[in-house]
Amino acid sequence: MRDEKLEKIAVQLYDPKLQYHNFDHIRFVLGEGEKIISRCKKEGVQVNESVVYYAILFHDAGFLDNHLTKGFTSKEAYSADLAVKALKGNGLDKELVRKVEQAIMATHVDALCQTNEDKAVRAADLAGLAADYTVFKKNTIDLKNEYEMMSGKKITWDQWKTMAAERIEQFLREDLCLTSDYFNDRGESRFHVNTRANIQKFLQDKSERIDG
């Protein structure tokens, strides 16, 4: 599904100066969300496509802003508030808006998913972790550059690798199974197996260059 009016509103909430949390990231996650929805439909898994779409669209909105000075405890809470204002302002159903807000909060590192929509949004957001290593590495480099820009601090490649690996592991505490293809023939989560393989390769990677 597409909502061109809301997409035009959402894109204004993503700063192109950000190397990772920009609207290109949203386009990628929307694509991953569509794949998840398609697999759910094939297996008869109930997922509200509108909730997933709108939650992904706004899940990193306002990322460059200082959420603390705006009265929010996390970037996810701030993004969720921006989503609620945009969706309510355009006449969307209150219950749908509530579910979108919840699904955005499910992308927080410490969150536990309560619904299939929560799982779909979190899984789509994290899909790049289990992608080909070239995609994984580009994302981690973009995140490093973004971190340095936002914090005003330089960090060595080795320091970043350790920080990033520890952070990624925090996102692996929960299975996000919605469809049968989530597990491999050995009953292991493909997402966890592929992500941990990327982490191991990343920790051994001496080069900060994408093609290195």
Language-model features: locations:
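His-Asp-centered metal-binding catalytic motifs of divalent-metal-dependent phosphohydrolases/nucleases
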Residues: V29, E49-L68, S79, V100-H108
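Short alpha-helical hairpin
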Residues: M1-Q12, H25
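Divalent metal-dependent phosphate-bond-processing catalytic cores, especially two-metal-ion Mg2+/Mn2+ enzymes
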Residues: K17-N48, F58, L92, V109-G212
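Membrane-interface starts of transmembrane alpha-helices
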Residues: D93-V97
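Active-site metal-coordination segments of metallo-dependent hydrolases
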Residues: P16-F28, D65-Y78
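An active-site-proximal "capping" alpha-helix that borders the catalytic cofactor pocket
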Residues: V29-L30, S74-N90
